Amino acid sequence: MAEAYLLEKLRTVEQTFTELTRRLADPDVAVNPTEFQKVARSRAALEETVNAYHEWQSLNQQLVDARQLHKEAANEPELRQMAEEEIAHLSHRIAQLEERLKILLLPRDPNDEKNIMLEIRAGAGGDEAGIWAGDLVRMYSRYAKTQGWQVTLVSESLAEMGGFKEAILEIKGDRVYSKLKYESGVHRVQRVPATEASGRIHTSTATVAVMPEVDEVEVEIDPKDIELTTARSGGAGGQNVNKVETAVDLYHKPTGIRIFCTEERSQLKNKERAFQILRAKLYEIKLREQQEAITSMRRSQVGTGDRSEKIRTYNYKDDRVTDHRLGQNFSLSSVLEGDLEPIIQACISRDQQEQLAQLAAEQA
């Protein structure tokens, strides 16, 4: 690996990994479950990189030995040919491993491990936009199921002709944000609505916002900025229906964000859920501000995740989904059934390549 700065990074990672391994064996850490889990997670995050680095070191030593054998076998054609084949094989494996190591050393998004709030809003297109928003709720729910994630509908505003004016899903599981963060933006659909007698194709949109869940300590909310009212809500049945004010209407004055929660059975639970959604929305605003500062220096080829950015078109006539950031097409029927993994992996790969290009430019 010619890049000295990458070798230096790998040595630093190895030293940190060794120190974390030592700390796990420390009796003082072992008796503190919170600290032990924190150290264990930090160590686990570095393990793949360290193992790949050790494999790279081993392959390089094997390459040195193969070259020495090739040099010493000047008068033995068969042995010399074997050494040449081994040198070519090892060189190829080392080159592949170096590319993998470069990706492993890219800065990690601190939000990648987090659960998310996924907000889907009907956009342009009238009733059809609400129906389309409902289709997206179904698509993401199906994708989450393939990943083994848990999905809960935490807030909804139903559209008159079906679907949603707005829906917020809470999605919990392993590294949810790391994959779904690429879904933020405008999703456009081109199809013939069921109500269209003439068979004319309509274009409608829905906006997706992906918000990592945050703790109270990460986002401060001034109580003076909140207006909170309650209302009666139809529940799951029984005496509480329309008699007890369990619904919560929360308004955040500085941003104009309004959240109406009715999904929980108690007013307290709906209040907690409303504040949870508000924290996620405020954190997403902060993230977007940081993102805009970054993209002013580097325009990501994958896209900024801006809500106003059209990221994808779903064309029913041609059974085609076009991701405009990637310039690639995918099967519409597969995607709508929740097969988003090919698109998401392509976004991750493109993002990594863009970061690698920036890193190389900075080192040049």
Swiss-Prot record:
Compartments (UniProt record): Cytoplasm
Position of the signal peptide: none
GO terms of molecular function: translation release factor activity, codon specific
One Pfam family here: RF-1
InterPro entries: PCRF (IPR005139), Pep_chain_release_fac_I (IPR000352), Pep_chain_release_fac_I_sf (IPR045853), Prokaryotic/Mito_RF (IPR050057), RF-1 (IPR004373)
HAMAP family: Rel_fac_1
Entry similarity comment: Belongs to the prokaryotic/mitochondrial release factor family.
Purpose of the protein: Peptide chain release factor 1 directs the termination of translation in response to the peptide chain termination codons UAG and UAA.
Name the UniProt record assigns to this protein: Peptide chain release factor 1
Lineage of the species this protein comes from: Bacteria, Bacillati, Cyanobacteriota, Cyanophyceae, Acaryochloridales
Gene of this entry: prfA
